[in-house]
Amino acid sequence: SNYTTREDLYNLAENGMIERRRRAGSLVARRSPEQELVTLEIPDIGLAIGGRDRAYSYRLLHKALREPDAAIYNEVALAGDDRLFAIDGVHLADGRPVGVEHRLLNAASVPEGLQVDFTLTSPGTWLLQEVSWTRGEYRITAEGASEQDAEVLECAPGQACLVIERRTWRGEAPITWARQIFLSSEHELVARFTTGGR
């Protein structure tokens, strides 16, 4: 529900894990030396759904090898001088849509991705199993479903959703950017933290 999403984001902000900014959304907070080390893992969505005793499946909606859109900074930054492999799909639990995923792969960093049959496995699962990465970045927001995403999610436009944008790199080479839109009642974020021995 919208209340649950707001409450979760409030709790993350209260614990210093995210910064909430008017008109900019919620961003992962910068860590000062005095703060705890907080880790958000990259989850395998299929395993997470299966862990709740639900049957997971992924449906590929669209894939294309293309040039980056010069007007979109994230695409240009991800592609550099290379092309992008765009993949759109939907995550399902017990046959019902719970999340839409829009993903871009740097075709030069992950050329083997062009040969993968994403009707058999989700891009996220394949990446976690086959592609090493050294650093990542999260951006987590609460948003209303767009008309296009609402149609795929079988919900009303504007329904509360948890939106996760994630980028990963191997060294300085960009690997992937993903935007995942989940129905707010269908996804959770789990963070583990330590106090640094204090």
Label each region the model flagged.
Residues 19, 50-51, 77-80:
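Short, charge-rich binding segments
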Residues 27-41:
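Short, cationic-aromatic polyanion-contact patches
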